[in-house]
């Protein structure tokens, strides 16, 4: 694990972008993408760049269950707003939150991931240590699955909705087992509210109670944090 401390999320986005650029020059074909506020500056750097993604595949970590892709709170909408509309890919993949048969959707998404090994995975981290929507207690070897969102996650995401009652209670998420197969993982985290999770992830025991702690076992992980998020290291 390599930890890089930056002044702010703008600098963090630039460093994450530089790491991506290096991997693309080395032949990266598939990007694993995350949503939430942490990776936004990374996407802004991509949009400003001259990088061409027309021959590349993207695979997103997760999507809410029960929300249409056209809904402005869906992760599909988020990705189009922050990246896809400006930088077209050969193929974009997200779980279908409106799939009638979630078991079949899980099989479909696992097949997509298996057919497109992820070269570069961008991650955020939840206050409770979740990566993707893999909440505490999630088995480390799990692949795509339906998640019942933790109350802390629902509360954290409620700022994007009119009311906490509007926040979906379930999501489809790429599993930790799939995330760990990514060749390179870059995790970005900013703000004091992430400090406890960052410290536990890096210094604590490897335990399913802290999903991100499994990253200690990965061969190529870069953690980009501002001083606040790094304050308990």
Curated annotation (Swiss-Prot):
GO biological process terms held by the UniProt record: carbohydrate metabolic process; glucosamine catabolic process; N-acetylglucosamine catabolic process; N-acetylneuraminate catabolic process
GO molecular function: glucosamine-6-phosphate deaminase activity; identical protein binding
EC number: 3.5.99.6
UniProt keyword Hydrolase, yes or no: yes
Pathway recorded for this protein: Amino-sugar metabolism; N-acetylneuraminate degradation; D-fructose 6-phosphate from N-acetylneuraminate: step 5/5
Keyword Hydrolase appears in the UniProt entry: yes
Pfam family, one: Glucosamine_iso
Gene Ontology, cellular component aspect: cytoplasm
Stored CDD domains: GlcN6P_deaminase
InterPro entries linked to this entry: Glc/Gal-6P_isomerase, Glucosamine6P_isomerase, Glucosamine6P_isomerase_CS, NagB/RpiA_transferase-like
Catalyzed reactions per annotation: alpha-D-glucosamine 6-phosphate + H2O = beta-D-fructose 6-phosphate + NH4(+)
Active-site residues, as the UniProt record annotates them: 62 (proton acceptor), 128 (for ring-opening step), 130 (proton acceptor), 135 (for ring-opening step)
Annotated PROSITE patterns: GLC_GALNAC_ISOMERASE
Keyword tags: Carbohydrate metabolism, Hydrolase
Role played: Catalyzes the reversible isomerization-deamination of glucosamine 6-phosphate (GlcN6P) to form fructose 6-phosphate (Fru6P) and ammonium ion.
Family affiliation: Belongs to the glucosamine/galactosamine-6-phosphate isomerase family. NagB subfamily.
UniProt-recorded name of the protein: Glucosamine-6-phosphate deaminase
